[in-house]
Amino acid sequence: MKTYIETNKERFFEELFSLLRIPSVSSLEQHKPDMQRCAERLVELLLEAGADEAAVYPTTGHPVVFGQKLIDPSLPTVLVYGHYDVQPVDPIELWHSDPFEPEIRDGAIYARGANDDKGQLFMHIKAFEFMVREGGLKHNVKFILEGEEEIGSPSLAAWAKENKDMLAADIILVSDTTMISESVPSINCGMRGLSYVEVKVTGPNKDLHSGHYGGAVANPINVLCDMISSLIDKDGHITVKGFYDDVVELSDEDRAKLSRAPFDLEEYKEFLDIKEIKGEAGYSTLERTGIRPCLDVNGIWGGYTGEGAKTVLPSVAHAKISMRLVPNQDSETITRLFTEHFLSIAPDYVKVEVIPHHGGDGFLIPISSPAYKAAEKAMTEVYGIEPVPSRGGGSIPILADLQRILEIDPLLMGFGLERDTIHSPNESYLLKQLFAGMEAIALFYRYY
């Protein structure tokens, strides 16, 4: 694969850049034509790589790309999942180059989607291409590439149910996560789920003069802050009744395996420019961000936030809250429990609403599975060191849906790094990670 990469490197850049130049931002209506254009370009790349068939399939939202190459029904089938939609680029003024005009500098590609997830799904197309052209492919390979991952995949689960037979496979292979570091590879054997809600606290029927009414009328922002502060106690435990009922404690053996991941607390604090860490008592930082649930306020607003001063007592206050969940916690159940709890602590002098948004369940895969062992062997060969099994703190809710619908496990071979700043300005992807990913994926097919 190394020789194939070196020989075709310039073509690879040209093809990947053709994807990165398409502003496939799924959350913005004005980019709907770009979503279709990106899907059609992926079909071209799959067919050129050696797929027997590939097509764009409509959904209730943005389209899905499906392609496949069937060698022999008796052989194992790998279903490659990826997403071609990207995050918005705001704030655009912080980018050092045009987010949709990819540049190579300092050994990395800079563009929106360079890592998440166009760069990583492109690795799969090229590894597949290599295996087909070199005659080494001994698997049936299917691709399912969606355009709604960044907005919670609202259409894919229903589409997958309707096309379950077409998607039948033995494993879901995914590259949409990070490694521990450039020198320490890891295989993600689980991810957290998500419950996302918006809360609204309403007081008086209009904004009031704080001099005339302050001290006599409840301020919705003050009330909201009090309610939010009560959601987590001094030990970092979430106070929502029933929140932890389905959380399964990890065994000492599993905690020991996860602790193999190198972690320097002082480096961590320096990187974030913070003096101390804070979280749930009794757990390490890696455990808090991987195997334990958490609750965070993602945004809070109300009243006057413009330039200068305006002394109002606001009528309404809002907040958006995410809860990261661990496997065995049900997203819909947690959303219901949160709603019941938040309404129960609301004082009677304000009106409180909870508006559920998207969510999804977490998942785990056994590290004893043949697919995990094949990935472990492949990454060891590429990096010269055995990968560490890790648990992702983020969420890809659709993977739990696909796991349930198709009755197969996902395997996450991610090659991104924290330095890639996905979802932020100046997203990038190291060339050596791009090429190492191609090598490792090709080796996965050899060993699986």
Feature locations, PLM:
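An extended, acidic, His-containing surface patch that forms the Zn2+-binding/catalytic region
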Residues: 48, 181-182, 239-316, 327-340, ...
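Flexible glycine/proline-rich, aromatic-decorated loop/lid segments
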Residues: 186-202, 411-413
